[in-house]
Protein backbone atom coordinates (compact mmCIF):
# COMPACT_ATOMS: atom_id res chain seq x y z
CA UNK A 1 0.00 0.00 0.00
CA UNK A 2 0.96 3.61 -0.55
CA UNK A 3 -0.20 7.02 0.65
CA UNK A 4 0.13 9.34 -2.34
CA UNK A 5 2.87 11.35 -0.66
CA UNK A 6 5.73 11.24 -3.14
CA UNK A 7 9.12 10.79 -1.45
CA UNK A 8 11.29 11.85 -4.35
CA UNK A 9 11.88 11.88 -8.08
CA UNK A 10 13.69 9.07 -9.87
CA UNK A 11 15.36 9.09 -13.28
CA UNK A 12 15.01 6.45 -15.99
CA UNK A 13 18.48 5.02 -16.72
CA UNK A 14 17.66 2.22 -19.15
CA UNK A 15 14.76 0.40 -20.82
CA UNK A 16 14.89 -2.98 -22.54
CA UNK A 17 12.25 -5.47 -23.68
CA UNK A 18 12.69 -9.25 -23.79
CA UNK A 19 9.83 -11.71 -24.39
CA UNK A 20 7.06 -9.13 -23.74
CA UNK A 21 8.59 -8.01 -20.43
CA UNK A 22 10.17 -4.56 -20.18
CA UNK A 23 13.04 -4.16 -17.74
CA UNK A 24 13.55 -0.62 -16.49
CA UNK A 25 16.43 0.71 -14.41
CA UNK A 26 15.67 3.76 -12.29
CA UNK A 27 18.02 5.88 -10.22
CA UNK A 28 16.23 6.31 -6.91
CA UNK A 29 16.73 9.20 -4.48
CA UNK A 30 16.77 6.85 -1.48
CA UNK A 31 17.55 3.13 -1.38
CA UNK A 32 18.15 2.78 2.37
CA UNK A 33 16.81 -0.60 3.59
CA UNK A 34 15.33 -1.32 0.16
CA UNK A 35 15.34 -5.05 -0.59
CA UNK A 36 14.69 -7.26 -3.60
CA UNK A 37 10.98 -8.11 -3.65
CA UNK A 38 9.95 -4.78 -2.13
CA UNK A 39 7.09 -2.78 -3.65
CA UNK A 40 7.74 0.71 -4.98
CA UNK A 41 5.26 3.10 -6.58
CA UNK A 42 6.55 4.45 -9.90
CA UNK A 43 4.22 7.17 -11.21
CA UNK A 44 1.54 5.52 -9.10
CA UNK A 45 2.15 2.01 -10.47
CA UNK A 46 3.11 -0.67 -7.94
CA UNK A 47 6.27 -2.41 -9.16
CA UNK A 48 8.48 -5.04 -7.55
CA UNK A 49 12.21 -4.58 -7.07
CA UNK A 50 14.14 -7.32 -8.90
CA UNK A 51 17.71 -6.00 -8.64
CA UNK A 52 19.62 -3.31 -6.74
CA UNK A 53 22.99 -1.92 -7.78
CA UNK A 54 23.95 1.01 -5.57
CA UNK A 55 21.19 3.58 -6.20
CA UNK A 56 20.11 1.99 -9.50
CA UNK A 57 17.06 -0.22 -9.01
CA UNK A 58 15.63 -2.60 -11.60
CA UNK A 59 11.97 -3.45 -12.17
CA UNK A 60 10.21 -5.76 -14.64
CA UNK A 61 6.99 -4.54 -16.27
CA UNK A 62 4.56 -6.71 -18.23
CA UNK A 63 3.06 -5.52 -21.51
CA UNK A 64 -0.42 -4.95 -20.07
CA UNK A 65 0.97 -2.48 -17.54
CA UNK A 66 2.98 -0.70 -20.22
CA UNK A 67 -0.12 -0.38 -22.39
CA UNK A 68 -2.56 0.68 -19.66
CA UNK A 69 -0.36 3.29 -17.95
CA UNK A 70 2.01 6.08 -18.93
CA UNK A 71 4.99 3.84 -18.16
CA UNK A 72 4.81 2.81 -21.80
CA UNK A 73 5.63 6.40 -22.79
CA UNK A 74 8.83 6.61 -20.74
CA UNK A 75 12.20 7.19 -22.34
CA UNK A 76 15.73 7.29 -20.95
CA UNK A 77 16.27 10.44 -18.89
CA UNK A 78 12.61 10.90 -17.95
CA UNK A 79 11.68 11.67 -14.36
CA UNK A 80 9.17 9.63 -12.36
CA UNK A 81 7.49 9.98 -8.97
CA UNK A 82 8.74 7.56 -6.32
CA UNK A 83 7.08 6.29 -3.15
CA UNK A 84 8.22 3.35 -1.04
CA UNK A 85 5.50 1.05 0.30
CA UNK A 86 3.75 1.91 3.54
CA UNK A 87 5.04 0.26 6.71
CA UNK A 88 3.19 -0.37 9.96
CA UNK A 89 3.28 2.78 12.06
CA UNK A 90 3.96 5.13 9.14
CA UNK A 91 1.92 8.32 8.90
CA UNK A 92 -0.74 8.34 6.18
CA UNK A 93 -0.39 11.87 4.87
CA UNK A 94 -2.53 11.45 1.76
CA UNK A 95 -4.94 8.53 1.34
CA UNK A 96 -4.48 4.78 0.99
CA UNK A 97 -3.49 3.67 -2.52
CA UNK A 98 -3.03 0.21 -4.00
CA UNK A 99 -0.79 1.16 -6.91
CA UNK A 100 -3.32 -0.30 -9.37
CA UNK A 101 -4.12 2.17 -12.14
CA UNK A 102 -7.76 2.52 -13.27
CA UNK A 103 -6.96 4.45 -16.43
CA UNK A 104 -5.06 7.37 -17.88
CA UNK A 105 -6.11 10.98 -18.27
CA UNK A 106 -4.90 13.77 -20.52
CA UNK A 107 -3.93 17.23 -19.29
CA UNK A 108 -6.13 19.73 -21.14
CA UNK A 109 -5.14 22.96 -19.37
CA UNK A 110 -2.36 24.29 -17.16
CA UNK A 111 -2.43 27.68 -15.46
CA UNK A 112 -0.45 29.47 -12.76
CA UNK A 113 -1.63 31.97 -10.17
CA UNK A 114 1.16 33.20 -7.94
CA UNK A 115 2.91 30.15 -6.51
CA UNK A 116 -0.03 27.85 -7.22
CA UNK A 117 -0.55 25.75 -10.33
CA UNK A 118 -3.85 24.41 -11.62
CA UNK A 119 -4.35 21.50 -13.99
CA UNK A 120 -7.43 20.33 -15.86
CA UNK A 121 -7.49 16.64 -16.72
CA UNK A 122 -9.78 14.78 -19.11
CA UNK A 123 -10.78 11.53 -17.40
CA UNK A 124 -11.55 8.36 -19.35
CA UNK A 125 -15.29 7.51 -19.42
CA UNK A 126 -14.77 4.41 -17.26
CA UNK A 127 -13.84 6.40 -14.14
CA UNK A 128 -15.96 9.55 -14.50
CA UNK A 129 -18.67 8.26 -12.17
CA UNK A 130 -16.11 8.15 -9.34
CA UNK A 131 -15.14 11.82 -9.62
CA UNK A 132 -16.51 14.10 -6.92
CA UNK A 133 -15.51 17.62 -5.96
CA UNK A 134 -13.32 17.59 -2.83
CA UNK A 135 -12.91 13.82 -3.26
CA UNK A 136 -9.75 11.74 -3.30
CA UNK A 137 -7.85 10.74 -6.41
CA UNK A 138 -4.28 9.81 -7.29
CA UNK A 139 -2.46 11.30 -10.27
CA UNK A 140 0.90 9.70 -11.13
CA UNK A 141 1.06 8.50 -7.53
CA UNK A 142 0.27 11.92 -6.05
CA UNK A 143 -2.71 12.45 -3.73
CA UNK A 144 -4.26 15.86 -4.50
CA UNK A 145 -7.86 16.90 -3.82
CA UNK A 146 -10.28 17.00 -6.73
CA UNK A 147 -11.48 20.49 -7.60
CA UNK A 148 -14.35 21.30 -9.93
CA UNK A 149 -15.72 18.43 -12.02
CA UNK A 150 -17.44 19.23 -15.31
CA UNK A 151 -18.44 16.74 -18.00
CA UNK A 152 -15.56 14.35 -17.39
CA UNK A 153 -12.94 17.06 -16.86
CA UNK A 154 -11.65 17.65 -13.33
CA UNK A 155 -9.40 20.33 -11.89
CA UNK A 156 -6.47 20.01 -9.51
CA UNK A 157 -4.91 22.88 -7.58
CA UNK A 158 -1.28 22.13 -6.79
CA UNK A 159 0.60 23.77 -3.91
CA UNK A 160 4.27 24.83 -4.27
CA UNK A 161 5.58 21.96 -2.10
CA UNK A 162 3.91 19.36 -4.32
CA UNK A 163 5.31 21.10 -7.39
CA UNK A 164 8.79 20.99 -5.87
CA UNK A 165 8.71 17.34 -4.81
CA UNK A 166 6.97 15.76 -7.82
CA UNK A 167 6.98 15.77 -11.60
CA UNK A 168 3.72 17.74 -11.92
CA UNK A 169 5.45 21.09 -12.41
CA UNK A 170 7.09 19.74 -15.58
CA UNK A 171 3.83 18.41 -17.03
CA UNK A 172 2.32 20.13 -20.05
CA UNK A 173 -0.91 20.15 -22.02
CA UNK A 174 -1.37 16.84 -23.82
CA UNK A 175 0.67 14.82 -21.33
CA UNK A 176 -0.79 11.53 -20.12
CA UNK A 177 -1.16 10.85 -16.38
CA UNK A 178 -1.99 7.69 -14.45
CA UNK A 179 -5.21 7.76 -12.42
CA UNK A 180 -6.13 5.64 -9.41
CA UNK A 181 -9.62 6.07 -7.98
CA UNK A 182 -10.13 6.13 -4.22
CA UNK A 183 -11.19 2.63 -3.13
CA UNK A 184 -13.84 3.90 -0.71
CA UNK A 185 -15.42 6.05 -3.40
CA UNK A 186 -15.39 3.09 -5.78
CA UNK A 187 -17.06 0.85 -3.19
CA UNK A 188 -19.80 3.38 -2.41
CA UNK A 189 -20.60 4.11 -6.05
CA UNK A 190 -20.68 0.45 -7.08
CA UNK A 191 -22.74 -0.58 -4.04
CA UNK A 192 -25.35 2.09 -4.81
CA UNK A 193 -25.41 1.03 -8.46
CA UNK A 194 -25.93 -2.61 -7.48
CA UNK A 195 -28.73 -1.79 -5.02
CA UNK A 196 -30.52 0.40 -7.55
CA UNK A 197 -30.23 -2.33 -10.18
CA UNK A 198 -31.68 -4.90 -7.75
CA UNK A 199 -34.64 -2.56 -7.22
CA UNK A 200 -35.13 -2.10 -10.94
CA UNK A 201 -33.95 1.51 -10.93
CA UNK A 202 -31.66 2.44 -13.81
Label for each model-derived stretch:
Residues 1-202:
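Conserved loop->alpha-helix
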Amino acid sequence: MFTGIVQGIGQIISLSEVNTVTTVEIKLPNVANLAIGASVSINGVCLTVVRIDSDIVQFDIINETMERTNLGDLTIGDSVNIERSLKFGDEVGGHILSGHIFGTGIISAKTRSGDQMSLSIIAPPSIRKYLTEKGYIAIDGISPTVGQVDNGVFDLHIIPETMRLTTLDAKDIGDVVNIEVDSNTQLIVETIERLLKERGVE
